[in-house]
């Protein structure tokens, strides 16, 4: 039964850990976890228009009791 050659495993695992660390650091550079100085643009409240606000909707009154003639 042939033996498994594990001589390159150390190098492979080391490079994998280093590359994962680098990828993680690059991803975290783009994230803002704590905002130190608030920007004025974000402090302004913007009104979001919803699709149903653009349309005219009919508002019905509740049903009245039966009218007797």
From Swiss-Prot:
GO cellular-component term (any): proton-transporting ATP synthase complex
Family: Belongs to the ATPase protein 8 family.
Lineage start: Eukaryota, Metazoa, Chordata, Craniata, Vertebrata
Compartments where found: Mitochondrion membrane
Residue numbers bearing the N6-succinyllysine modification: 55
Pfam families per UniProt: ATP-synt_8
Keyword Cell wall biogenesis/degradation: no
Full protein name: ATP synthase protein 8
Modification N6-acetyllysine occurs at: 55, 58
Ranges that cross the membrane: 8-24
The keyword Transmembrane helix is assigned to this record: yes
GO biological process, alphabetically ordered: proton motive force-driven ATP synthesis
């Amino acid at each position: 039964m042939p033996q498994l050659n594990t001589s390159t495993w150390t190098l492979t695992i080391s490079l994998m850990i280093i590359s994962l660390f680098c990828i993680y650091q690059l991803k975290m550079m783009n994230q803002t976890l704590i905002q130190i100085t608030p920007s004025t643009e974000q402090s302004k409240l913007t009104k979001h228009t919803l699709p149903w606000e653009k349309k005219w909707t009919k508002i019905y009154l509740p049903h009245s009791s039966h009218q007797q003639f």
